[in-house]
Each structure stands twice: as C-alpha cells, then as structure tokens.
C-alpha cells in the first residue's frame, strides 16, 4: 500500500488518442431532439467517435411564425453553454446537429453564426453547420436546380429559400411541414414525407 508506483506502472497520458483516432466529433443538439443522435449511432465509421452535448430548449413551441422566431432567439443564449461543455472532451470537429439558425439570414447569416461559435471554441477546430453541409453535399452532386422539404413554418422556409439562392442554386419550391414542436419533428411519419416528395416536390 505504501510502496511508490514504479515508472513502468504509471499511467501516462497517451500522445495519440486511440478512441476517435480519425476524428472525435462533438455533436451539438437541442435538448428536444431525438433524431440526430439516433442517426449518428447508425453511422459509425471506423476510428470516428461521436460526443453529444445538448443545449436547453426552454421554448419548444413551433406552431406559428412568431413562436418559431421565439425559438430561434432562445437557442442563441443556450448554444454557447453546450459548446463550452463539448470542448472539455477535446474534440477534433464540431458538428451542429440542428439546422434552423444556420439558414437564418442567408449566406451571410450562416457565416455570422459560425463566427459566434468560433468565439467559444477558438480558431483551430473545424465547424460544420447544417447550411454549410447542405451546400457541400449539393455541390458534390453537381446540383443546379433544387426543391426543399423542411419541418419549418413559412418564416423558416423563407430563410432556407434565401440561403439556397444566395449559394447559387435555382430554387423551384420549398415546402414546410409546419411541425408543432421541436420534438414532433422526429415523429413525422415517413409516409407523410414521401407523400410531400411525390405529390408536391417531384418534378420540381
């Protein structure tokens, strides 16, 4: 008990992480969200680890344009705390597991949102927002003309339309499902999504 630990038995901090050796991705999600974590758990590339942090949603009501705007304003105050917590696991990348605010204000708004995140996490770590990821994916597919399906109210759909246009796409149509709450987004039946795609977006 009283013997000193030998040098051979001392636990030293690893120079290179073996968990998440290719990437440790901190995923910042709303406290109401049940979809992003579920999806990430089904997509685990070798050498990549997910680390989830939630920001509190005090106002989950999305049933009108006014309530949707209140939701956007509220999360601006709680996201920084989740980022602060996430940084303690020393991630190599930040992924924003929410999309609404990343479209707000179009291309410039997404840039400003990313800069606010940088104020918390610093200049070195990579940051992926929903809007930036959408643009990168569409460009990878060579898309020029797009139609979009969102869970948002009309005020949110306008922001998506603006962002897509400002990033160079011809936007034929944006349809919002007008989900009542932040949690109900994940409860949308697949049949409802498919119906909208086939009957309102297909051909656009």
PLM region spans:
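N-terminal glycine-rich anion-binding loop in soluble enzyme alpha/beta folds
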Residues: 6-80, 154-192
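Solvent-exposed alpha-helices and their adjacent loops that cap or buttress functional pockets
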Residues: 16-21, 43, 118-121, 138-141, ...
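Glycine/small-residue-rich loop that forms an oxyanion/phosphate-binding "nest" at active or ligand-binding sites
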Residues: 83-126
């Amino acid at each position: 008990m009283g013997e000193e630990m030998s040098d051979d038995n001392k636990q030293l901090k690893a120079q290179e992480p073996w968990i998440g050796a290719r990437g440790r991705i901190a995923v910042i999600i709303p406290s109401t969200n049940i979809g992003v974590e579920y999806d990430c758990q089904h997509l685990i590339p070798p050498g990549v680890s997910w680390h989830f942090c939630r920001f509190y949603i005090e106002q989950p009501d999305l049933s009108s344009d006014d309530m949707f705007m209140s939701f956007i304003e509220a999360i601006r105050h709680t996201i920084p705390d989740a980022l602060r917590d996430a940084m303690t696991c020393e991630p190599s990348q930040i992924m924003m597991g929410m999309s609404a605010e990343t479209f707000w204000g179009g291309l410039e708004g997404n840039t400003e949102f990313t800069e606010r995140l940088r104020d918390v996490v610093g200049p070195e770590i990579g940051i992926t927002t929903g809007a930036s990821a959408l643009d990168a994916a569409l460009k990878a597919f060579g898309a020029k003309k797009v139609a979009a399906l969102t869970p948002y109210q009309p005020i949110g759909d306008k922001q998506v339309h603006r962002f897509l246009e400002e990033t160079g796409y011809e936007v034929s149509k944006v349809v919002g499902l007008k989900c009542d709450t932040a949690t109900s987004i994940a409860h949308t039946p697949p049949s409802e999504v498919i119906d909208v795609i086939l009957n309102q977006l297909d051909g656009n």
